[in-house]
Each structure stands twice: as C-alpha cells, then as structure tokens.
C-alpha cells in the first residue's frame, strides 16, 4: 500500500532545503506518478512538480513554464526513501546534492 509522506531535505552545501510531498510504495521507493515540492531558498520559494514514470527510473523536475521535454533530472526514488539518504538534481548549472533529514508519514483512516 502506498503511503503519502512529506520529506525535508537539506542541500549538502548549505543555504537551502527541499520540502517534498510524494507517495512511497510498500518497498520504500518513490511511487510512480506526479508529485509536488518546493525549494526553500530562505527569502524565496521555488515550487516544482516532479514525475516518476517507472519503478527504477530517475525523476524529472519541472518548474513554472517548462515543457514536458525540458525537465531537470533528479535521482530521488532510485534508492529507498529514508532519513540520511542522498539524492541529486542535475540542471544546466551542474549537480545539486541533498540529504533527507526527516520524513513525516500522513496517516489515512
């Protein structure tokens, strides 16, 4: 059964963090589908949508105005989603590494 979670991840270089709402499958991996998050840059927020197409695939990250063929690549979901795990985002400026600091599980009744 899929669980909905909120992840807090910090940029390894410091200065900003990611807050992500996504589904996690029964094995602890990011569930297939479209999910939402934002970068907390301190003074500004940058919202994004990301999408995972298959079980072992990397995800694509889309910002406001991006077309479906212009997404950045993200490795969240390649490994199980757990506290202490790292993931990377690759964009035109390089590689950005994040570490998951906390996970909040939403419970449905």
Task: Go through the PLM ranges and name each one.
Residues 22, 48-54, 78-80:
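Short, exposed beta-strand/loop patches in secreted or surface proteins that constitute
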């Amino acid at each position: 059964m899929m669980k909905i979670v909120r992840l807090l991840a910090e940029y390894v270089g410091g200065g900003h963090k990611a807050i992500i709402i996504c589904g996690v499958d029964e094995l602890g991996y990011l569930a297939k589908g479209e999910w939402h998050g934002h970068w907390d840059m301190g003074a500004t927020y940058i919202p994004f949508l990301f999408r995972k197409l298959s079980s072992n695939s990397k995800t694509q990250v889309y910002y406001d105005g991006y077309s479906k063929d212009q997404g950045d690549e993200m490795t969240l979901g390649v490994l199980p989603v757990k506290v202490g795990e790292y993931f990377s985002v690759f964009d035109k400026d390089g590689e950005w590494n994040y570490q998951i600091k906390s996970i909040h599980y939403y419970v449905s009744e």
